[in-house]
């Protein structure tokens, strides 16, 4: 019992002790619970404090964004001002590192303020601290962030022991980094790098102290250059170091403007601009130099927090997925919650996906772990992903994913390249683990590092049409021990791709239209497309910009960074265009049209005409030396020379505001098509085999030869009955007889050509001759080398047919004289002329003094272009004797007139012009000469020249000393003749139109007569002259089917002196035709003068052609002021071509082929008052030619049409048609295998440069095929481009005559026959 009692006491004691211990433990638990509550409160307080600090920093960020926007705009303005120099290779706004303007909002540029503190996410203890978890910058706008060149290099990479300490220290470092940085002293200069420079490739021992440079990039330099030639410099991304002075150019020395720019750039250094899009796109991928440079490292690579982690439209994704446990049939994975910016929203839950299939949904607040079962780990591979579920959508599953199962390797899979362009590509892959970062290698060179949770990469600044090999190597954040060794070692994936060939550039942006500097122009402005440092867009080398209206180029500027140009309103009104577009021009073609810019309606309204002010007198220019021309014309000479060399460009492309430097080849070989990148058309129908093509060529050649022989026999038969005169040149030049009519290009033809849009076949020698396309009506003296240059330019013209039909070519056609003793003149066929505008020829410069007089006489009578028979039949009238009373004793021997000329011209007061006429774009010289005036005014005053003076002059010069008196007339002048005095001179005669005609032609005969007998007096009888005329007439060119006098009022003068337009029946001045006669035809110099027969025996009205007689009913002295229509022979811009100061206000611009309405006669300055596009102003007479309209209806139709069609037939006879020189290019005969009408089949814009032909036509081609697949050929007297795949060469063993008879000269002018297909010249050797 005692033992039991003791035992009980002992148990009670132990029980009490246990109760005491329990109480103590309970008290301890209570204390711990209280401590936990207090700790939780303390933690919540700390969190609240941090949130307040975040809001404060966020507000500061917004403030900085506003300041940054202001500074960015100021920087952009500064760069635009600095852009006055050529920034093609130095514009930072369009360089490879910047795809957008720095004036973008801060939400796009400064969204990376929350940056990670290290390259990886993991710390040794497994904890991590990312500033972006506490600081969320503003949202970004747009689909993709901007590509920037700024890389922060100052963020702290050090790690602290605790997350809070790391956060505090890094925040302090971030806030103080830009203020603690040392500032250089001295003056700040903005520079641009001229060349790329890698210090490690340089010769210096300390390359790390130098800055790497990229050509075209901006940088700052401080102070002065040191003794070694280096500056202290800073790049825009904050890097500082030494800069070699010979590698940079100074842009601006304005320190005040640079101060704000520098501060804005330093503010950018606080921000991380690299990042990726929603898919993790890394945009900061372009290294400082081009891609194929040496191994490039961007330091720490891309930072942890990127643009993809922020933004209202980007859903925060879970982070750091981890494989906790892998079993045979299941796995356990864990992750960390996403970082949600304040105010963005809340995360509702998480989806756990297996191969994109949702296996479970875990609510927010639960453990971030999941057990995934029913997996066959040993045989299959599974992709497990974690996805955030929010009210704004789900996060990207590939940003938190990993692979488990069989054959899992470290390397990424499904590596592919998409969106390949000329200079960029997009690389994507499927990561094995979203925690892995990836290293990008390009062509076996390390290129960049892509951070974790990103699986896309954008390449920029690639080279067009180049193959690239890309390697992506996974870089695990920790060793994947769960994988076997061989699977851990597989870290790389490869893919190859090729960039696209350089293609059309991007179009300009923001096209606007506003009023130009003058009332006649508008200014079109645009924003150039983004250009790389080498001046390319989409891999195409940008050369300039073209302005288009209704598909036609109306203006062009050749400058890659041009932002505006002027467009003539006249062209827009003619096209009835109300809007314009702009295209980027490049060597690889044009871009697509830009956005349409409407032309303000008030700009399209034509201005009211300005009253004509009295012209101011201008001093006359000397004529002797070439430098005098420079002094007289100043800059206009060079401008007009450029126009001269480029005026034949196709009007489809408009005019070039900055004409390129001409480069005319010496031959046709290597000739390019008029338009770049000409497209070769494809034949329609069944292809013709080679054997059939050769058979066609042989058959066609034989058929044409037989047809020619039959037609020649028929023509000769008709000719024997109808011809009045015979000459051996008939076979060359064709036959003009009543039975063989040549169809002229009348006004009806002009209109039909425009309406039908089809180019008819014409032969040489049948075209309507109007004003010369190469000279002025006022004498502009051109030397032979200039003539040769223009002849080459005509060949370069691509066969284009001008509406202004060349009188030069008409002269060349007529100048088929042979270098024999029997010198004779090819007499024009004035029996078949109507609708011919009156023109003046300019006087040539005589190179050899010994032959001056003979050459002048020769050129006076040479090359009279004949006019064609009108399509309106008129009754012929019998000839009647010449009326002697109409002579008025006006005619004297030529020598008397010449010898008395000096006295007369010395007293002439009307020879000084007050307004300078614009030069013809082709001539390059002034458009008038005093020698013209001397001859013209003398012909009127020779009535009062006494016979004694004349005879004494001749008596003293038995050796024809009239050559000496002629030399002052041949001196080169640049002053303009007084046109009104000439008109007054002829108008005062009061006689019919026959008198000037007789004087002109007869004088040449008298000059010839004087050459044989210098002491002849003025007692020369009409009978003597008639006898001489009848004798010499036999030597005249038989091309003239009628007497020389058959012409409209003074048409013999005007067609001999083709150049100055005037109305029918209005007296006009007379001038020599010599310059045109030698222009391009290279007629040999003659020791004897050419003989111009008199027309005494044929001078009466009855002997005139009825066409001429009816045209000349109006008395020239009593003609009323009438309205006439003219056609522009050249493009004319008074702003650049006129030497007159009031040109823009008073003179009208016009384009070649434009119809102009003219009121009255030209004034004393040689200007007409005309109207174009409802605007009235002055028009230089040497730039236009009159069109003789049959009636008012025809005139109205022409005025309504506005322009003559470009397919108007024009003589385009090459310059060596009559010379002994031959083309240096080869000529071949080709037969057409298919029908071809460029207006229907050609894919090219300038269809007027191409020839129309039918199957079986024989086409003569010159030279070799050009690079676009076109020949330059001739058919039926027209030259142009012909597609090579439509032709087959005619066999050499077949003799083909393409003209009516074998000619003694190459390139003879054929006649037009009645055959359906006209014959062109033959080239049988």
From Swiss-Prot:
SH3 domain mapped to chain residues: 186-253, 1121-1189, 1225-1292
Pfam families per record: fn3 (PF00041), SH3_2 (PF07653), SH3_9 (PF14604)
Keyword set, alphabetical order: Cell membrane, Membrane, Repeat, SH3 domain, Synapse
Fibronectin type-III domain ranges (all copies): 315-408, 411-493, 507-608
GO annotation, biological process: neuromuscular synaptic transmission
Gene Ontology cellular-component annotations: plasma membrane; synapse
Chain residue ranges for the region called Disordered: 153-181, 601-778, 988-1010, 1040-1090
Biased amino acid composition, Basic and acidic residues: 158-169, 627-641, 696-716, 763-774, 996-1010
Tissue expression: Brain, cochlea and retina.
Subcellular location: Cell membrane; Synapse
Compositional bias segments (type: Polar residues): 664-676, 717-727
TM segment ranges: none
Subunit comment: Interacts with RIMS1, RIMS2, CACNA1D and CACNA1B, and potentially with other Ca(2+) channel alpha-1 isoforms.
Biological function: Plays a role in the synaptic transmission as bifunctional linker that interacts simultaneously with RIMS1, RIMS2, CACNA1D and CACNA1B.
Family per record: Belongs to the RIMBP family.
Domain remarks in the Swiss-Prot or TrEMBL record: The SH3 domains mediate binding to a proline-rich motif in RIMS1, RIMS2, CACNA1D and CACNA1B.
This protein's name: RIMS-binding protein 2
Species the sequence originates in: Gallus gallus (Chicken)
Taxonomic classification: Eukaryota, Metazoa, Chordata, Craniata, Vertebrata
Gene name of the encoded protein: RIMBP2
